[in-house]
């Protein structure tokens, strides 16, 4: 799985660095035809998923020290950030494995742990919401009489 979904340098490097090549990454590839982008050389395990047309992010998978999320310990934890409706964010606060967005706008992004503490259905819901919130908006038609101006 890691060798086919990740494109981080060599195939061996991709395989070795790819604990983030989760079923979520396969879901994103299969449902949205989107492969991970690795934009930062200094954090090769940070995977950005974005719309091809507008380049807006809809998911960011990375690992962070547990203490950055308010948890005990400094071990690394795989997480994913999603763009989210503020009402949904407030309803999910306090749920196990859900955190205020790490390194993003906390009013419109949310972080979910990828350690099994968040049900797969919740991850899928958050991914789909994020994808919809960040997709290109349809262009409005020009008002009558203004097409030729």
Language model features with spans:
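Charge-dense, helix-prone N-terminal extensions
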Residues: 1-149
């Amino acid at each position: 799985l890691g060798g086919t979904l990740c494109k981080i340098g060599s195939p061996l490097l991709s395989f070795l660095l790819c604990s983030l090549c989760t079923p979520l990454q396969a879901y994103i590839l299969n449902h949205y035809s989107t492969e991970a982008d690795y934009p930062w050389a200094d954090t090769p395990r940070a995977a950005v998923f974005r719309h091809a047309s507008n380049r807006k992010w809809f998911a960011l998978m990375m690992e962070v020290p547990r203490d950055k999320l308010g948890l005990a310990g400094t071990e690394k934890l795989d997480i994913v950030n999603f763009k989210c409706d503020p009402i949904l964010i407030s309803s999910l606060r306090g749920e196990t494995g859900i955190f205020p967005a790490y390194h993003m706008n906390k009013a419109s992004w949310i972080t979910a742990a990828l350690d099994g503490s968040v049900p797969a259905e919740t991850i899928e819901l958050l991914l789909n919401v994020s994808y919809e919130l960040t997709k290109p908006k349809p262009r409005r038609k020009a008002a009558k009489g203004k097409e030729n101006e």
